[in-house]
């Protein structure tokens, strides 16, 4: 599913990209540029910010609707002047479509086609047309966009070919080509479609002037309008020949173009005279040539009087308009012109109105161009371009003059910086420098929400910074990381605090909510939309919790009349089991769903998971043991999940059982029995003898009816949670799921955790196949691609593709979070110590188990083993199922040990592991696995030595020897003095000599190995001679310290 980019949103909202970028920044969503992608949840929030803009941008302005009055505007009588439209610089526009549509409401008062009559009074509809936004080119029904050849309203003669338009620019609409055939073939007249003039309109058949009238119109100017005032969107024609054209049949003999020998007006932007030569007299008021200066008070072309009109070539003559343009003739940087009216663009026969920049219109608008003639711009009141003709640009392939006197619209010139670019440059200059790099800082309150396992690249994108700069800053803060490495929350907090940002790591629940929102799945909205009519009663979900060996599974076995304890290794539960039993209550058979959780301390996560999905918790406490540590922990889980608790006092048949003691102990934890005035139900049961079971089930149903609203919508796609998962050799991945709402059917496309697929089969707790599972029904699901983790949510997707995409995104999130969690933060000090002390010892493990919950519990228990920082424990792979050859290959490559929990390898795999020397350990009880791994970790520790004092000797006399130096005559006060042991000299309690060695030890004249307390001896300390009487010589040795 393609993501939407910022500029696409800006186009949809009808605003500029920088407005959308600024809005995203205000919303706390920092994006780098207009080409950055935006997530669907952010798009929805953004659309709330632009409710009207988005709607206006998607509809064309009503001012440009073509109406049935189109033939009426074709009469070249008095009409309103060209109305300037708000330019749309980023969109190519056909030449001046907006004025053509805007001038529709002005009816022509005279049916005679007299273009010489100026329009003195413009129509009152002009101001609204100026305020109308310029619509997109595809939505402009301007006449210039319609080819003239197939127009049905115009009675064109037969044999009139439609020449394809010459591509001159993005704003050029289709123009009719030259008409080589037939006398009287009309060119584009004032008001005809395809003309570049702003008032051009398609005439109706009844309003069209006869061809015989054309020779009488001697008041038309000869030649082209200057190019300096043309809108930038007009096409540029290169060096098409612009000389005299042969006469047209029906016209008085091909009159030559006046001024043909002179240079083409508009050719030189630096010439003193621009535009068309005057036909008669002086310009009014002696003003400069119109079209020369965009800032002049007078714009547009005065209408010269007299002179024959040049005509295109007849049949058999040279191709009118010159050769077809090619890319070499095009200007270097064509820019998009103003759609609508340029400066002074006037309708034929009407005075030109001013364009942008405050310039007023000229004395009169020009005529539309002829087919086959040179194309003129739509601005400046001159003659509009001739469709199909050559450009009015300079000759000699020297490029156009556009931009020489300012730009009528379009993108800024290369090198000119936008306001946004200047602002970013200013912010970069003002940004404080950390470690030699400048990064934009926050104000200390700016909140950045970052997903789990994000990298520095993600962080840099949020604050619009360079990832390399963040790597440098992090290095100066004492942390080493790459730009794409997944980092933990502490590292981001450190970096955010330095840069002035408040870092918030998105919780897994929020990540899941945003992920599903990208696929238009909102679970919260589904729950809110459900009414009372949609809900139906469902069975209660009851979790059995308590301390290990207090009889939880035995109690469930007694309720279900089965024997699960015998199947569990070591007699302790190491999986979550889900069952459903039916109890008759008040004459109605009511099902109850039971979830059995382990009680060992290693299964804390399982108990917490069981408490989250339950409605009622049964706290099992042995009457002989009382309240134990895991009892308190299970109680805290249930209270944290805010579920009602029913206490089952088990083993009341044992000798020494005291149920009242249990009631008293639980009072300290806010569980007050009903007989003591509380609201908690206590039931005395004996799982071994089967007593009190009915009372327990009745207590569960009474609690459910009294304090819970157990209803769910079963008429929708299933939603729920995966309680347990395992890999079956014949069935593949098998997930035990609990449906919380909706109904799960065989054949549904399901996604559970990182696994997805279609439900191939569903089995109940007895192994029987079921076709559907209603709310509160636990079933085993077959057909997933991988084993889901215990506690993963599952849902039914609309199709397989959506399920696969959700699973892949979940997998990526979990992988990044796991990488961030497994990353060992290496500071510069740690790195230096590692270099000095050598390689850090690491124990690599590969965990394989029979269930996802068991593997998770084993991994958590192993990571809790604390043996110091010198040894590192790494779990490089974990999985559900038997040990495979791939596991052995990974163990060979990484020097790892494989731990199998309730699994065994194939014979071939075992032989392969023996050949490769891979150590595989198998365990069926979690205690043994934890103890062995802890012993292995301690074996990797380097030995620690501690100082053990051997004895002390007091110096009584000093003997000086030239051969041995000073020798101390001493009396052993305590312990013993041993030859070659370490020694130090103490003088009045202060160490004067340390790290010495007793090199000689004699008893009288005999060498001695050791001298005990109460004996005298002579001690030589080698080269150390600073000895005095009453000094104390203390001896010690370094002994290895046991690691524990």
Curated annotation (Swiss-Prot):
Biased composition (Basic residues): 413-422
Location of the protein in the cell: Cytoplasm
Domain of life: Bacteria
PROSITE patterns for the chain: G_TR_2 (PS51722), IF2 (PS01176)
Region (G1): 546-553
Family to which the UniProt record says this protein belongs: Belongs to the TRAFAC class translation factor GTPase superfamily. Classic translation factor GTPase family. IF-2 subfamily.
Name of the protein: Translation initiation factor IF-2
């Amino acid at each position: 599913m393609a993501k939407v980019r910022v500029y696409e949103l800006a186009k949809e909202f009808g605003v500029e990209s920088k407005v959308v970028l600024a809005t995203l920044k205000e919303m706390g969503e920092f994006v780098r540029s207009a080409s950055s992608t935006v997530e669907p949840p952010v798009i929805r929030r953004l659309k709330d910010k632009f409710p009207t803009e988005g709607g206006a941008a998607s509809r064309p302005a009503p001012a440009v609707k073509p109406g049935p009055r189109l033939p009426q505007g074709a009469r070249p009588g008095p009409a309103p002047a060209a109305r300037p439209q708000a330019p749309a610089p980023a969109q190519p526009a056909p030449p001046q479509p907006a004025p053509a549509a805007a001038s529709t409401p002005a009816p022509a008062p005279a049916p005679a086609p007299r273009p010489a009559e100026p329009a003195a009074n413009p129509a009152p509809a002009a101001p609204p047309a100026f305020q109308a936004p310029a619509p997109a080119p595809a939505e402009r029904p301007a006449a210039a966009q319609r080819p003239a050849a197939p127009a049905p309203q115009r009675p064109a003669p037969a044999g009139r070919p439609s020449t394809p338009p010459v591509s001159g620019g993005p704003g050029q609409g289709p123009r009719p080509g030259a008409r080589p055939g037939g006398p009287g073939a009309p060119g584009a007249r004032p008001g005809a479609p395809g003309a570049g003039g702003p008032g051009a309109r398609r005439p109706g058949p009844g309003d069209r002037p006869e061809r015989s009238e054309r020779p009488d119109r001697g008041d038309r100017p000869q030649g082209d309008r200057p190019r300096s005032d043309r809108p930038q969107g007009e096409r540029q024609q290169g060096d098409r020949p612009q000389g005299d054209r042969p006469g047209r049949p029906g016209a008085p003999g091909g009159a030559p173009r006046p001024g043909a020998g002179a240079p083409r007006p508009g050719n030189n932007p630096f010439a003193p005279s621009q535009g068309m030569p005057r036909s008669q007299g002086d310009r009014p008021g002696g003003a400069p040539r119109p079209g020369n200066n965009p800032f002049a008070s007078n714009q547009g072309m005065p209408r010269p009087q007299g002179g024959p009109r040049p005509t295109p070539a007849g049949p058999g003559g040279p191709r009118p308009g010159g050769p077809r343009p090619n890319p070499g003739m095009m200007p270097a940087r064509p820019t998009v012109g103003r759609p609508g009216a340029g400066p002074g663009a006037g309708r034929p026969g009407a005075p030109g109105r001013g364009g942008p920049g405050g310039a007023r219109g000229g004395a009169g608008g020009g005529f539309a161009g002829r087919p086959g003639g040179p194309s003129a711009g739509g601005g400046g009141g001159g003659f509009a371009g001739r469709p199909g003709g050559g450009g009015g640009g300079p000759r000699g392939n020297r490029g156009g003059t556009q931009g020489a006197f300012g730009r009528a619209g379009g993108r800024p010139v290369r090198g000119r910086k936008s306001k946004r670019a200047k602002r970013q440059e200013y912010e970069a200059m003002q940004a404080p420098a950390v470690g030699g790099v400048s990064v934009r800082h926050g104000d200390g309150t700016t909140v950045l929400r970052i997903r789990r396992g994000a990298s520095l690249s993600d962080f840099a994108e949020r604050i619009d910074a360079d990832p390399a700069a963040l790597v440098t800053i992090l290095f100066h803060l004492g942390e080493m990381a790459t730009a794409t490495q997944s980092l933990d929350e502490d590292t981001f907090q450190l970096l955010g605090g330095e840069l002035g940002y408040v870092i918030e790591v998105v919780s897994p629940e929020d990540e899941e909510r945003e992920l599903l929102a990208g696929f238009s799945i909102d679970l919260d909205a589904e729950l809110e939309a459900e009414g009372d009519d949609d809900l139906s009663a469902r069975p209660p979900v009851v979790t059995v919790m308590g301390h290990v060996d207090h009889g939880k599974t035995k109690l469930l076995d007694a309720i279900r009349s089965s024997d699960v304890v015998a199947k569990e290794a070591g007699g302790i539960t190491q999986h979550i089991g889900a069952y459903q039993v039916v109890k008759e209550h008040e004459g109605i058979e009511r099902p109850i769903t039971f979830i059995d959780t382990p009680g060992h301390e290693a299964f804390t996560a399982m108990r917490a998971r069981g408490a989250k999905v339950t409605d009622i918790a049964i706290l099992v406490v042995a009457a002989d043991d009382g309240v134990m540590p895991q009892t308190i922990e299970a109680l805290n889980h249930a209270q944290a999940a805010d579920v009602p608790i029913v206490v089952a006092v088990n083993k009341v048949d044992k000798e020494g059982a005291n149920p009242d003691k249990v009631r008293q102990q639980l009072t300290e934890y806010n569980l007050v029995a009903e007989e003591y005035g509380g609201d908690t139900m206590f039931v005395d049961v004996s799982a071994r003898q089967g007593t009190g079971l009915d009372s327990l089930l009745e207590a569960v149903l009474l609690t459910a009816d009294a304090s819970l609203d157990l209803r769910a919508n079963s008429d929708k796609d299933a939603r729920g949670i995966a309680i347990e998962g395992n890999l079956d050799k014949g069935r593949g991945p098998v997930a035990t799921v609990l449906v919380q709402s909706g109904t799960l059917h065989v054949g549904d496309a399901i996604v559970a955790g990182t696994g997805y697929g279609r439900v191939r089969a569903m089995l109940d707790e007895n192994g029987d196949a079921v076709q559907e599972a209603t709310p509160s029904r636990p079933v085993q699901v077959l057909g997933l691609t991988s084993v889901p983790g215990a506690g993963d949510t599952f849902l039914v997707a609309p199709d397989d593709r959506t399920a696969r995409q959700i699973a892949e995104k979940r997998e990526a999130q979990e992988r990044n979070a796991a990488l961030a969690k497994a990353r060992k933060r290496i500071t510069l000090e740690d790195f230096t110590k590692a270099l000095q002390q050598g390689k850090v010892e690491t124990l690599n493990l590969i965990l394989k188990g029979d269930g996802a919950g068991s593997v998770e519990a084993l991994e958590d228990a192993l990571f809790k083993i604390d043996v110091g920082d010198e040894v590192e424990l790494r779990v490089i792979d974990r999985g559900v199922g038997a040990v495979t050859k791939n596991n052995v290959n990974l163990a060979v490559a990484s020097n790892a040990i494989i731990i199998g929990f309730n699994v065994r390898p194939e014979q071939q795999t075992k032989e392969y592991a023996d050949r490769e020397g891979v150590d595989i350990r198998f365990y069926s009880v979690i205690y043994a696995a934890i103890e062995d791994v802890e012993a292995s970790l301690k074996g990797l520790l380097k030995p620690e030595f501690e100082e053990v004092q051997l004895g002390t000797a007091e110096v009584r006399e000093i003997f000086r020897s030239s051969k041995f130096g000073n020798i101390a005559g001493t009396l052993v006060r305590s312990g013993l003095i041993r030859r070659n042991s370490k020694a130090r000299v103490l003088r009045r309690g202060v160490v004067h000599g340390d790290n010495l060695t007793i090199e000689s030890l004699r008893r009288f004249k005999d060498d001695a190995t050791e001298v005990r307390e109460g004996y005298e001896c002579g001690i030589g300390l080698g080269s150390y001679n600073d000895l005095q009487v009453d000094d104390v010589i203390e001896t010690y040795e370094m002994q290895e310290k046991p690691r524990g």
